[in-house]
Amino acid sequence: MISHRLHKIVLIICVICGSALAQQQPDLEFDTSVEKPAYKKDSPRIMFDEAHHNFHTTEGRYKPFVDLVMNDGYRVIRNRQSLSKTRLSGFKILVISNALGAEDMDDEGADTSAFNDDEIQAVQDWVKGGGSLLLIADHAPFGGAAAALAKSFGVQMRNGYAFDKENSVAGAPSQLIFSRENKLLGSHPITEGRSENERIHILRSFTGQALKGPDDSIALLKLSQSATDSPHFDAALSASVAGFAQALALKFGKGRVVVQGEAAMLSAQVSGQENRRMGMNVPGNDNRQYVLNVMHWLSGILK
């Protein structure tokens, strides 16, 4: 009896540990140093939102992103209050990554708007007056939670899962490849950088959604003619999203907006017992430089 109980206890512990190891964690070994910081003084202030059940936080899965931009000369302040005109005052950039309408992504209401009407109006007015927004919303349910805020800037979020068997990692059709070779990188200061060293050649995403921007927006990551969208990761039904994007940039009043339909590509994470890498830490892509270029454009040093 004791032996049987002990076996059950060990089994439970193994399951718990395996589950914990399988979770996404920040890659704390990823090199976030910047040889030549963009800002050595007068650091732009970034508000990083943590007030809306965000899946990504400054000390959690997005720590590598935060460390990288801080090493580039920015000052990052986390926000745990409702967004308002007063709260946004004094900040140059607002970063929102994977907000939710409920505490957990599996909870009922997770895909409902994470932002109330007053917050959406405050952010819209702030951007119109010269602020810059980086809005990141992954596959379902994150797209649903950010859809109302995105819509206020003319951006449609599909809130599904984007696939492209012809332009993706072999055996992983949701991990999309955007390169100069496959012509899925848009022409924009973000993809060109300030010099040849900053020029983007290839980017990789890690399962996201499709976006449709207003006519004056620029698709940074274009979805090809073979791209499709499904409401669930394993859904049998899918629809074409040819002409959509997985990231786009636009100017709004005096401000600027970048909307990302995939989040992991802007951080560096590990998952599973084998510590599989996901994001900037995966070799063979320019995701790290892309993060820097996005922030350079939002802060204004890229015109």
Role assignments for model-derived ranges:
Residues 1-5:
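N-terminal secretory signal peptides that target proteins for export/translocation
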Residues 6-9, 25:
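Compositionally biased, intrinsically disordered low-complexity segments enriched
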Residues 8-19:
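Bacterial N-terminal signal peptides
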Residues 22-303:
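Short, surface-exposed patches at the edges or C-terminal ends of soluble domains, predominantly
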